[in-house]
Amino acid sequence: MGSADERRFEVLRAIVADFVATKEPIGSKTLVERHNLGVSSATVRNDMAVLEAEGYITQPHTSSGRVPTEKGYREFVDRLDDVKPLSAAERRAIQNFLESGVDLDDVLRRAVRLLAQLTRQVAIVQYPTLSSSTVRHLEVIALTPARLLMVVITDSGRVDQRIVELGDVIDDHELSRLREMLGQALVGKKLSAASVAVADLAEQLRSPDGLGDAVGRSATVLLESLVEHSEERLLMGGTANLTRNAADFGGSLRSILEALEEQVVVLRLLAAQQEAGKVTVRIGHETAAEQMVGTSMVTTAYGTSDTVYGGMGVLGPTRMDYPGTIASVAAVAMYIGEVLGAR
């Protein structure tokens, strides 16, 4: 790329930075005063004219300054040399805050609150998708000789407790056998495979004796736990930040809030995140949702090196601090994965 093109990109980068910081359209004189561009105001004016002709910036109807377009933001994001790093103190604070979560729900609630505070946008975290989770542990506890508590723990930290009414009593030996059979069928398997295994076990042990009936009743309850669609659950925080930036949405705030409430668009965008550590930025119309015009979403997946638990990210106006937001989303996602993977 020629030096003139590089210089124009520096002008575009300066316009984006100033507009994000001030919300005010930017003129050539202001750019020369604030940034060390190394050229005259006349040259900057010419560069801005080229950027406008190519669709990277535009002139608001009442201003002599210019603001970035969606195309301009996309060029800026695509050519980010590096993401604004979080300080060691910030990273340590994030890690300590998330590690203090007592269980999966608490960790995710903390993550949403933290991400909304860091970015001053709407933070969204998807509960771990069951299809990618593995059964890490199964506990079978006798509450009474005819009533059991089943506790299923997945590798993503989800704990599900279910009561099984046996209809008949079983002794300690039968309870031990039941625990062993169910554990062998479930532990270490993906939830989709575990549901098949427990159904097969119930089919194989269809017999009139007490244990066969106990396996059947336990399998019925466990299947309810294993096939429940928790991937449709979202946690959101910081929606008040949308109203703080209401002027950025040009009258479309209500439709954006409705889209968030319906969750369909957000779930679709989060479901597209299949690789932990990879951050995706969708700007304006790139969300492919008419009701989300004027917004950008910065999303990623969280999980371990070999397992994606779910998607997460932030939503805000296209006038967004992209370097800072990308860094915050990536850092929080990394620490969620570490915290949940260690449990």
Curated annotation (Swiss-Prot):
Keyword Transcription regulation: yes
Alphabetical list of Pfam families matching this protein: HrcA
Keywords for this protein: Repressor, Stress response, Transcription, Transcription regulation
GO molecular function per UniProt: DNA binding
Biological processes annotated in GO: negative regulation of DNA-templated transcription
InterPro entries in the record: GAF-like_dom_sf (IPR029016), HrcA (IPR002571), HrcA_C (IPR021153), WH-like_DNA-bd_sf (IPR036388), WH_DNA-bd_sf (IPR036390), WHTH_transcript_rep_HrcA_IDD (IPR023120)
Keyword Transcription regulation: yes
Coiled coil: none
Functional summary from the UniProt entry: Negative regulator of class I heat shock genes (grpE-dnaK-dnaJ and groELS operons). Prevents heat-shock induction of these operons.
Family: Belongs to the HrcA family.
Cross-referenced NCBIfam families: hrcA
Entry protein name: Heat-inducible transcription repressor HrcA
Native source organism of the sequence: Mycolicibacterium paratuberculosis (strain ATCC BAA-968 / K-10)
